[in-house]
Amino acid sequence: MTEFDVTDGVHDVIEDTELPRRLKDEVLATAEERGVTKSQANEIATAVEAQYLDTRVDPLDPVGTVSAQSIGEPGTQMTMNTFHYAGVAEMDVTQGLPRLIELVDARKTPDTPVMEVYLEDEYAEERERAHEVVWKIEATKILALGDISTNVADMVVRIDLNEDTLQERWPRVDSTTQIAGEVAETIEGNLGVTVTQDGTILEFGPSEPSYRELLQLVEQLRDIVFKGIEEVSRVVIRREETERGEEFVLYTEGSAFKKALKIEGVDATRTSCNNIHEVHKTLGIEAAREAIINETMTTLEEQGLDDVNIRHLMLVADIMTNDGTIESIGRHGISGNKNSVLARAAFEVTVNHLLDAAIHGESDDLDGVIENVIVGKPVRLGTGDVDLRMGATQTSD
């Protein structure tokens, strides 16, 4: 017997196939669920193996060219617009062709960085608990907590914190005075001034009487983040139907993936980010590869182009992450780093590449598709890379 509750005969039939481990496990799980006999298992395994072998790429198949065509042709039907995110009011997310270009160019920061934050347990079920996570993620500036005024005669900046706002955002804190004290400490740490506190009223000023310094303090105060993640300007909360039932999901404007995963109540196993470089830094290159595939597929599906085979996107992601870092597909990345002089020159800045190659005395082995097309030689792919030899056997008279 095995970890699957099937007979040894069924197990041996499935294990003798050429299927990869993942597919074998899926067939074994199905055999366990359906309670199949050995003969039935043999039929199933044979059919699955035939399908699997049929989907494998033939030797010398130009997979790169096919992938480029299969992604590029649907790309001509994509829109150039930035749309609202589906179902989320007032949240703009780059979609269509601009988003696809962002991904293959491996831009360091997307035009509209977004995180999709899933929550754990009661945080996902209760709106009040979900809002607690919202206030931990969304950058709360001191300006949003009360009224700010300046007294030029006394050279004092006065902050009158709104008690209702403080209680709404931090309902589990014992008193608003305690929160006001934390605000005062934040101001002192950022501005280097001494803050006097009277309940929820804070006052501070420049060390020396100066109108200019007073105004500078007010300007600096505008940028101070009291709570939350500085990079996240807004969080939208939605109730959605997921594989776990109905739950609250957060969508952010701005991203700081590593910081978000550390927040209590955030489900790190399902939370995602549309910045592939942040995913790489936080979870590693394999996660970045998956992110590239998922983001690219999602972008195509949003445009009604979901019939693009995911293996084309997997090939692109494999090439972009092949050396352990994320490389763009362009003259500053993969295309610009090819060994072939003619292939580099055919992509962009032709004269520069040819001039550099001449200066450094480079040669071209004509191994790839582009360079052989340029010089008019048969491409070394498919039948172009196969030598045929006629066999002759001597027969006796």
UniProtKB/Swiss-Prot annotation:
It catalyses: RNA(n) + a ribonucleoside 5'-triphosphate = RNA(n+1) + diphosphate. One of its GO terms (cellular component) is cytoplasm. Keywords: Cytoplasm, DNA-binding, DNA-directed RNA polymerase, Nucleotidyltransferase, Transcription, Transferase. NCBIfam families: RNA_pol_rpoA2 (TIGR02389). This is DNA-directed RNA polymerase subunit Rpo1C. It comes from the Archaea. GO terms for biological process: DNA-templated transcription. The gene is rpo1C. Disulfide bonds: none annotated. GO terms for molecular function: DNA binding; DNA-directed RNA polymerase activity. Its main location: cytoplasm. The lineage of its organism: Archaea, Methanobacteriati, Methanobacteriota, Stenosarchaea group, Halobacteria. PANTHER family: DNA-DIRECTED RNA POLYMERASE (PTHR19376), DNA-DIRECTED RNA POLYMERASE III SUBUNIT RPC1 (PTHR19376:SF32).
